[in-house]
Amino acid sequence: MSNDKHIAPLAVVSMGCVLPGVDHFRALDTIADWETVFQSASPLAWSETSRPIQGRQMDDSGFDFKKFSIPPLFRKAVSRETRLALRAAEDALAGLVLPESLRDCCDQFCAIHLGSDAAYRNATKVGALRALAEKLQAQGCPAAEVRRRLDDYKQPLAESLGCSSHDRVGEMASSIPARIAHFAHTRGKCQTLDGADKGGLRLLQLAQDCFRYHDSQMAVLTSVQCFHHRPQAYMLLEQGVSQDACWLEGAISLVVCPLAVAHEQGWPVLTQLGDIVTTHDGSPQPEADHPAALYFAGANQVFCQIVEMVLRQHQRCEGRSFTGGRWQVNVAQTQSLTPAVDDRVAIVDYQPITGHPLDKTQFWQTLEQGEDALREHSAAHVNAEAFVRTTQQKLSTYIHRTMSFPAHSPSDVALKKPMMPAKKQRLDVTQLYALNSCHSWSEKIRQFERVAIIIASNLSLSADRLQAMRALWSGLPGSEGAIPLPELPSINHWSWYGACGIGTAQLLAQYFGISADCYAVEAACASSLAAVHDAVRALQAGRYDAVIVGGIETATLERDLVLCSAQMMLSVSRIRPFSQGADGFTPGDGGGFVMLTHHPVPRAIATIEAISGSCDSYSMTAPDPLGQALAIKKTLSLTAIDAQTVQYLEAHGTGTELGDRSEVMSLKYSYHRDKHSPLYIGSAKYNFGHCFAGAGALSLCKVLSAFEHERIPPTPVSELNVDLPLGDIPAEVPQQAIPWRLSEDGQRKAAINAFGTGGINYHLVIRQSS
């Protein structure tokens, strides 16, 4: 399948704004109205007198939760970022009537930078409990006494900072577009990205790349930024962000589509956006009629400048990012990318990351033999007196084993390339594993001129959350003596890198010694395939020559165990996808990386044939088989491959009764086949646990390893759930490794599912290279 359609200008058919003093885009009648937004700055509430930061923050205390279908129980769990983004999207969509024919193809893409107030509250609750437990243990208190006093403290802590089963959903960046999709009744693809102050630009480029295909016909692009505390600001100042600019909170939504769609629907076009580009060095300075912006809006920077461009009736806007390089958005299209000759994208190399060493041979042996990485919590990983209880309780966990990395402390991870201690101790452990996993790719990636690095990750890493505790610690409820604040490294140049998902991509680019477009993606447990989707679309459009893409997350941290336990999502023993009595998943640390290119590669491992997605957010937590089936249908519509020739499906397979049933039901709509050629199904989560943002990448690595060994590994759960409608497909779950025979056309073909909270679904079809 080929597509010679070039990237076309975007039609902006509506805008929505929620900024200080501005509740609607229509309130910005003149450029004077815009200038008022940032000219009345004052020192931010948490700013130090010795280092004042001027800005304007948002007050959304009057947010209408009922309008956006948020139950009273969950209201404290919903982040400020989510509330602002919902208001901006509502403003943008208010004047548009979306026909039913566009709802399946209306994407919801968002941009943020660093963490949310919800994430910071959750981290502070867990951090305070661990600190109190360690204090009592150091005083020689018996274990039973420590548990009792911790349990007594959990109630006032929950009353102070909030505590509900929705806490994990509320802190997830991907909940923002999922909630917008729920409000707007759209079912297109869904994700949140972090491109730092180029986040808006990445959203626009993603929309351009997506509109070349019929599975995307319009998009609601929303960028949002809040500034929560002093350590967050100081990390940004260390990166060169101006202390003198007005730091501006808020959210902006742009509704964009191809010009043809705007004309078909009779929508007025506010402006076109043609060239949407970045440059890494040797860039010209802004001309006199385009001076540098007088405000810093974080993830909202590009969209703020586009609003200003429209109000000033200028033909372009531009800026310099604190991450390096310049960006520019032109109304006219003066540049054109050359699309890839073939839509198929080659996989050049891959590297799985699990709780085992970085060894592909051991990875395959674990898969083939049906083994796992299950281990007991260590005292360093989980403070049992603080958190582990025999039954489900508030701010606790009820599981004793996970599939974790051997170490969660950066100091305990040996690097393949030396690093300064002042840098290493400020990075996240996932970043160190990522650097080690891609260590051998330096020469290979340097062969390509235009490169991107896209990381599926939690967008707010542990360092960001731990620094936030400094700001919230004084507000902790009283206890028996002050709770000591955990020691943290002072903030320096490397603190920002270790705090955010985009920092992982930036570190890899520096490690390879290359200039690359970098950003991070979060789409709940579908994050990795969402990142692969972005990479594939960009390669197909001719935007890059190669992309390193993957995902990684430490899903076994104390805060994740506590938050997931509150949702009753975890298995009391171990994950058993599709089994009788499946009771949840086991968290695992890991993920994987792949190197992709659209150029002909003589030794490609496999080719990605098609990828697409959907978001059916009728429920923020319950899976929906029709929404999952829509993602599969859209993917298969982009390839000439007959679904009946796909031999193996790597399932999302979370091992929950509801999730397993929903997934199997979704498969019968597209993968129904002759009873003599069953679809084989498996899940890497049995072997390595659920790696959250890294899950889809690990699934992809499993399929690639199976291609290489020409065998389908087992998911040995022993007793399958007889109530699953496997026979309707028909499908089988191998209990031991079986040969992966060539199909009648001499090929091996597979598909991969990745589903996430909020109804976010992605599906990929892959073929082994000849």
From Swiss-Prot:
Task: Check the record and name the Gene3D superfamilies matching this protein.
Answer: 3.40.47.10
What residue stretches are annotated with the Ketosynthase family 3 (KS3) domain? 342-768
Active-site positions, per UniProt? C525, H652, H690
User: What happens in the null mutant?
Assistant: Cells lacking this gene show a white phenotype and produce 2-methyl-3-n-amyl-pyrrole (MAP).
Q: Which InterPro entries does the UniProt entry name for this protein?
A: Ketoacyl_synth_C (IPR014031), Ketoacyl_synth_N (IPR014030), PKS_Beta-ketoAc_synthase_dom (IPR020841), PKS_NRPS_Biosynth_Enz (IPR050091), Thiolase-like (IPR016039)
Q: Which UniProt keywords apply?
A: Acyltransferase, Antibiotic biosynthesis, Transferase
Query: Which Pfam families does the UniProt record give?
Result: ketoacyl-synt, Ketoacyl-synt_C
Q: Which is one GO molecular function term here? A: fatty acid synthase activity
Q: Which class of enzymes does this protein belong to?
A: transferase
Q: Name one GO biological process term.
A: antibiotic biosynthetic process
The organism's place on the tree of life at top rank: Bacteria
Any idea which positions bind substrate? H652, H690
Q: Which cysteines are joined by disulfide bonds?
A: none
- Its pathway? Antibiotic biosynthesis; prodigiosin biosynthesis
EC number(s) from the headed UniProt entry: 2.3.1.-
Has keyword S-adenosyl-L-methionine?
no
Q: What does this protein do?
A: Involved in the biosynthesis of 4-methoxy-2,2'-bipyrrole-5-carbaldehyde (MBC), one of the terminal products involved in the biosynthesis of the red antibiotic prodigiosin (Pig). Catalyzes the decarboxylation on the malonyl group attached to PigH to yield a C2 carbanion of acetyl-S-PigH. Then, the heterocyclic pyrrole group of PigG moves to the PigJ active site Cys-525 to generate a transient pyrrolyl-S-cysteinyl PigJ intermediate (acyl donor) whose pyrrolyl group is captured by the C2 carbanion of acetyl-S-PigH to yield the pyrrolyl-beta-ketoacyl-S-PigH.
Quote the record's domain comment.
Answer: It seems that PigJ is composed by an active ketosynthase (KS) domain and by a chain length factor (CLF) partner domain that potentially decarboxylates the malonyl group of PigH.
Q: Which family does it belong to?
A: Belongs to the thiolase-like superfamily. Beta-ketoacyl-ACP synthases family.
Q: What is this protein called?
A: Beta-ketoacyl synthase PigJ
- Organism source for this protein? Serratia sp. (strain ATCC 39006)
Q: Gene name on record?
A: pigJ
